[in-house]
Amino acid sequence: MLSEVIARVELLIGEQTLSGGILTFLFIVVIAHFVLTRFTVHSRFWNSQAWTGVREEWFPKMRAKVRTIGNIRQMLSDGYEGFSKQNKAFALPVIAEKPWLVLPHSCIPELLAKSDSEIDMKIIHEEQLMHEYTTGSLGRHVVDVPIQYDILLRQVNRKLPLLISAFNEELDKSFCHYWGTDTSYSEVNLSETCEKIVTQALNRIFAGKEICRDEGFLEHSRLYSEGVGRNAIMVRMLPPLLRPLLAPFITYSNRKHRDICLRVCLPVIRERVQHTAAKRADAEHKWEPPLDVLQWIIEESFARNDPKELDPRMITQRLLALNFVAIDTTHMSMAHTILDLYRSPNSDDFLVGLREECERVLQANGGQWTKSGLDDLVCVDSTIRESMRYSDLGYISLTRMVVDPKGTQFNANGTNSSSPLSVPPGIRICVPAHAIHRDAALYPSPYEFQAFRFSKAREKYRGTQTELSEPKVSIVTTTDKFLPFGHGRHACPGRFFAAQQMKLMLAYLVQNYDVEKLSTKIQNKIMVGTTKPDASLKIKVKRRKV
């Protein structure tokens, strides 16, 4: 066997013989690698932890990693029941990645109280998305100088009332296009049409009317977003030394889709930059700045007085960055909400309540959606929030990396231990969001979709003094038991915008369409913990006669 291996190596390197010295050197390298990895700080730490999903078998951790492809949620739930409920952290293996240290639910206040210099979130995001390879230097810059996200936080959230009409107009146009106006049932692909509706409607706010109605931009911005996430996984699986060599080939499609989007955006951006410059020079210039994120990015770029920021390629990259963070999560959340609502045994009752609420609120606001009107859609809000709990997209939350050179500590050594758990730098930590969302101690009947779970209290006290004193729980309310948007100071800043758009979508859908009741046997697809609707699932829809 050994001679056969040597012969293959000889053939590979083009040598006729391998000297004993080379063989000895290779042997020493292998042994040294084994010893160093076996006795490093990280190895000692992981060897001291309890593991979930690891069985007594040959190559136990390697085989456990492979099982995480389709079974990581069950492994997480097993660890939650076996360790978290005893206030003990546990290790969770992941395919092609370092393991996670999963902290118990009780550690969330501790985790949130720690400074960014002790545990860091940005490193995790960079590690997951591999911006250096997947989005290139432009993508790296828009992450380091996140003008687009600052605008989403400051401008969009503040100007939501002014954006509702434009969004609703685009919502009507895209629903009519992709779901049709036929009053007889016809089949549509749920995931595909939801994605296209969301992409067009959100880009009315992001990129403006002209770009959001360009089929090329809509298609290739969608493919770009999908490619960044998918190709990041492939790049992460490469040995670090091979990434600079192979990543450019893997991520070629990202650059192709970005360049097609640039060709669509280029004339629009150039025209806007010219008009904005003229308006800044002469307030009487006859041009009204559009009300959208693209325009606010251009204005902020002028304010920074940096020519690089006004490069159309840079501005297009910022639009694609917004699409990446917003489109996928929003369209999957909406597809899950539709699935959960229409496959529920109580769907008829839920729909009666939702339609009654929409009609009442719309009538009270003069037949137009307003910011205050959307805030009054407590049943619509609850339905989406419950779907985000019941069909949560991710399996972990509050992901951080320990960056303090001295490490950090958590009270997570078990209920019978008074000594804290010391975690060395470089270890990735998280909390088991999926298991928390399914904990019967936190949510009664957690495996049942209850559309009005979060609106019952507000409905009960509507219009009374008690309503004023009751804490208002909505989609955007993050808690230690509702974690789709994270929690604490790093909770998703775009959730206020996302919540309003999802409420408008669901309100529009239930008012204007009937969806044929779905089978309770329809299951979501789960891949390495991420839940997605079945990409091939078709549903029957028809326009309501109203």
UniProtKB/Swiss-Prot annotation:
Heme binds at C492. It is a single-pass membrane protein. Pneumocandin B0 is the starting molecule for the first semisynthetic echinocandin antifungal drug, caspofungin acetate. Pneumocandin B0 is a minor fermentation product, and its industrial production was achieved by a combination of extensive mutation and medium optimization. Inactivation of three of gloP/GLP450-1, gloO/GLP450-2, and gloM/GLOXY1 generates 13 different pneumocandin analogs that lack one, two, three, or four hydroxyl groups on 4R,5R-dihydroxy-ornithine and 3S,4S-dihydroxy-homotyrosine of the parent hexapeptide. PROSITE patterns: CYTOCHROME_P450. It is found in: Membrane. The chain crosses the membrane at residues 17-37. One of its GO terms (biological process) is secondary metabolic process. Pathway: Mycotoxin biosynthesis. The keyword Oxidoreductase applies. Cytochrome P450 monooxygenase; part of the gene cluster that mediates the biosynthesis of pneumocandins, lipohexapeptides of the echinocandin family that prevent fungal cell wall formation by non-competitive inhibition of beta-1,3-glucan synthase. The 10,12-dimethylmyristoyl side chain is synthesized by the reducing polyketide synthase gloL/GLPKS4. The thioesterase gloN/GLHYD exclusively interacts with gloL/GLPKS4 to maintain turnover of the polyketide side chain. This is Cytochrome P450 monooxygenase gloP. It comes from Glarea lozoyensis (strain ATCC 20868 / MF5171). The gene is gloP.
